[in-house]
Amino acid sequence: MNMFNAHIPSYLVPKNLNSNWNVGFILGILLILQILSGLLLTFFYVPCKEGAFESLSRLVTETQFGWFVRLYHSVGVSFYFFFMFIHIIKGMWYSSKYMPWSWYSGIVILILSIVIAFTGYVLPDGQMSFWGATVISNLLEWFGKAKVITFGGFTVGPETLKRFFILHFVLPAVVLVIVLLHLYFLHREGSSNPLTLAEAVALLKFYQLILFSDVKFLVIISMFIGPQVGYGIWTLFQADNDNSILSSSENTPAHIIPEWYLLLFYATLKVFPTKVSGLVAMVVVLKLLIILVESRSKSQAVSTAHHHRVWTTTSVPLVPALFLLGCIGRMVINLDLIIIGIYGVLLSTTFVQKLLDSSRVRA
């Protein structure tokens, strides 16, 4: 209880926090809701080729409020990643890279969340899910037995659904443990604030004022989640229409489009000519976020010129460059898009390298 009291209600935070610091709380609540809705779905889902698609169809049409649980679990992951990307951008903007263990644990949460989302994307056994999994399975041909171990065979089949179901069930528990570590490292080093990473003089307890601010923000977000679940207002957060069709290995979709939060990594696979080069590019994009923490200067974090921040000419274009790659992931690929995509990857790596160089100069 003393540890809980020290890390939650009695935890001291800077007095000048703004709404950007509500996002971490929102992410925790969304993660818990995803786990709870997923547990409810496990009572009805059948992880086999013959029953996966049909079991979810029966859940939506024949079970009371089954449609709500199914759609919330599908839509909730989009909101989860939306706020996670905002949380990452906020960390870059407000120099959270100066808290390396919090940054590293956050990146691990991101990577595991991507794996969980992809395995969950495959489980409904829809047309787009099947062919999306086929694309990834083809990439693993270079890893020999890793492909058979992961997919249960040389192609996507019944064993794939069973293994992905186990991963999708177990990995969220791992994420919860890392989230606790993330909170521990954050509270050990102290929260950042909009002005500086130096220890703030004006502090207040997390409970009541800050907690009520988080809850107020959560209520506002729920006003967007409800209409999205019921009416699908934002098409970007909705699944592709082809995923409402039972998968068929004989009919290939005209254009494979994964969920929007996977578009950045899918684009890096599309714009490079070979599987190996595309896979390397995808790893490089993830590596960019990891090595950002190495751009922290050894000098004091306080600077009236804000040199400790990343809003310099070499780093601000990083987010638009990655956003451009995500847009390419939704388009039918052609030579022009390939050139633009390759330039986007090169520009992103250049921006991060410049950021590292400038930090060495300042240090």
From Swiss-Prot:
Binding annotation for heme b b562: 73, 168
Residues the record lists as binding a ubiquinone: 187
Molecular-function annotations in GO: metal ion binding; ubiquinol-cytochrome-c reductase activity
GO biological process terms, semicolon-separated: mitochondrial electron transport, ubiquinol to cytochrome c
Residues engaged in binding heme b b566: 87, 182
Cofactor binding description: Binds 2 heme b groups non-covalently.
InterPro entries: Cyt_b/b6_C, Cyt_b/b6_C_sf, Cyt_b/b6_N, Cytb/b6-like_sf, Di-haem_cyt_TM
Entry cofactors: heme b
Transmembrane segments: 23-43, 67-89, 102-122, 164-184, 210-230, 271-291, 309-329, 332-352
Keyword line: Electron transport, Heme, Iron, Membrane, Metal-binding, Mitochondrion, Mitochondrion inner membrane, Respiratory chain, Transmembrane, Transmembrane helix, Transport, Ubiquinone
Pfam families for the chain: Cytochrom_B_C, Cytochrome_B
Compartments in which it is found: Mitochondrion inner membrane
SUPFAM superfamilies for this protein: a domain/subunit of cytochrome bc1 complex (Ubiquinol-cytochrome c reductase) (SSF81648), Transmembrane di-heme cytochromes (SSF81342)
Topological category with respect to the lipid bilayer: Multi-pass membrane protein
GO cellular component: mitochondrial inner membrane
Function noted in UniProt: Component of the ubiquinol-cytochrome c reductase complex (complex III or cytochrome b-c1 complex) that is part of the mitochondrial respiratory chain. The b-c1 complex mediates electron transfer from ubiquinol to cytochrome c. Contributes to the generation of a proton gradient across the mitochondrial membrane that is then used for ATP synthesis.
Family in the record: Belongs to the cytochrome b family.
Quaternary structure and partners: The main subunits of complex b-c1 are: cytochrome b, cytochrome c1 and the Rieske protein.
Extra remark beyond the main annotation: Heme 1 (or BL or b562) is low-potential and absorbs at about 562 nm, and heme 2 (or BH or b566) is high-potential and absorbs at about 566 nm.
Protein name (database record): Cytochrome b
